[in-house]
Amino acid sequence: MKLHFFNARILSMEEGMEITMGEVWTEGTRILYAGPSATKQEICRKLQREDLEFNREIDCDGDLLMPGFKNAHTHSGMTALRSYADDLPLNEWLNEQIFPVEAKMTPEDIYELSRLAILEYLTSGVTAVFDMYLTPESIARSFEDMGMRCVQVSALNNFSQSLELMEE
């Protein structure tokens, strides 16, 4: 899919992070061009291409176009449990409410709940996550099926005792 975003305020991650008016050209998952507006011929010349036909052209109407956010701490399969008994202290919430519910969840439940989480991430501008949760195979499959980037991280904690009693 070849996309042409134009009439956009572009925030690059270059030093100074200035916002400039311009356009972005993409092909598949690659950004071909991000910069000031110019004629198609001028940009094709910069890209060393004869021509480029777009599948879709999107007028951003002056809206901000920027790189996607990365969420470095997610539990995708538990997104739907976020507000479940959320008025309790953390350890009580986890031990008495969340862990018993999670014990009943199947890998397929976690797969479907992860897909729901991915939709939430995308509506928030998140394009990649670091996820740590049960049944990593289900999580990986959901991200692969939805076409989103995910790094699986193993747990580095032990909730079986209080923080005061844990050894470093």
Where are these regions (language model features)?
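Conserved beta-strand termini and adjacent loop/short-helix elements that scaffold enzyme active sites
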Residues: 34, 60-61, 153
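Divalent metal-coordination and catalytic microenvironments
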Residues: 8, 24, 29, 62, ...
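Active-site gating loops and adjacent loop-to-helix segments of metal-dependent hydrolytic enzymes
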Residues: 80-112, 146, 151-168
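N-terminal metal-binding scaffold of metallo-dependent hydrolase/deaminase domains
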Residues: 1-46
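Active-site-proximal flexible loops/turns
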Residues: 14, 68, 78-82, 132, ...
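Divalent metal-dependent hydrolysis catalytic cores, especially in the metallo-beta-lactamase
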Residues: 114-162
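Residues that scaffold the ATP/ADP-binding catalytic core of kinase and kinase-like folds
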Residues: 13, 34, 79-80, 93
